[in-house]
Amino acid sequence: MYRLVFILLLNLPFTMVRAQVNIWEGTTVHKRVELTPYIAEPRQASGNLTVIVCPGGSYFWHDSEIEGHEVGRWLQSNGINAFVLNYRTAYVPAFITHHRLIFRGNRYPDPQDDLCQAIRYIKANAEKYHVDASKVGVMGFSAGGHLAMSATELFDAEDMPAFVVAVYPVVTMTEPCVHKRSRRGLLGDSRSRNKDLRDLLSLERHVPSTCPPVFLVNCVDDPIVDYRNAVLLDSALTARKIEHQYIQFKTGGHGFGASEQKGTAESRQWKSMCLEWLHKIKKQI
């Protein structure tokens, strides 16, 4: 019995961790933003890659399970360290009412600040989590995909992710294929018509030459986020000669995340294709 307890204690850092940490604790930012680690066992670790997972939810809420913790468990089971980020969103009351016309609420750049701090936190605690600080990337779904890609355009070099995975992402903040709910969620009611912010956060317009490798996937039949968002990003990445892989499925819709039930058999292939891509790029970063 004591031997079993001893073995469990030894392996505690490498089991499926659900001990959430507040990334802003001890800083001047008095917010509670939680990061949930899923650390792969050392014998399974695949090149010691680490992925920060950003669930979608139109910048109003999070699809925390299918696009969050289920993704974390899937990555962990495949030898990849994962941290699920509960970044700040506008929340449901802001979706129902327009109180952010008067009160600031959560809006840009709050989610971006949270992601930047998450990257800094993981790098600063690399030894604690047994991760490689130079191999920390970001994976985002829908609005979380916009957040993930925005890191490549808005963050300083030392905070830049090593790679990005964007799954059915929101990309543009301008017509004709903008996802208006995400735009309102990110910008807030008082700034949703601000042309400068719309331009700044239309990611297809500002791909830097320093952009890290990108894995991009979506479905033509997406009923939520116009599939042309990903097409715009693919074109921009190609024009800038950024290493990337774009996979466009005919069917699958939106919001399937890491689920084995949602989407279609075609769209669920994204996981195996993504793992193959991650195994390829881990030697380059």
List each language-model region with its residue ranges.
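Short beta-strand element of the alpha/beta-hydrolase
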Residues: G47-G56
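Primarily recognizes the serine-hydrolase "nucleophile elbow" in alpha/beta-hydrolase
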Residues: C116-R181, R198
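Mobile cap/lid helix-loop segments that gate and shape the active-site cleft of serine hydrolases
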Residues: G26, P169-H206
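Catalytic nucleophile-loop/oxyanion-hole region of alpha/beta-hydrolase
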Residues: D63-S64, F83-A133, G263-S267
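Short beta-strand/loop motif that positions the catalytic acidic residue
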Residues: T210, L216-N218, D222
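N-terminal cap/lid segment of alpha/beta-hydrolase-fold proteins
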Residues: A19-S46
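Short amphipathic alpha-helix adjacent to the substrate-entry channel of hydrolases
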Residues: S64-F83
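C-terminal catalytic histidine-bearing segment of alpha/beta-hydrolase fold enzymes
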Residues: V33-Y38, P93-R100, V231-I285
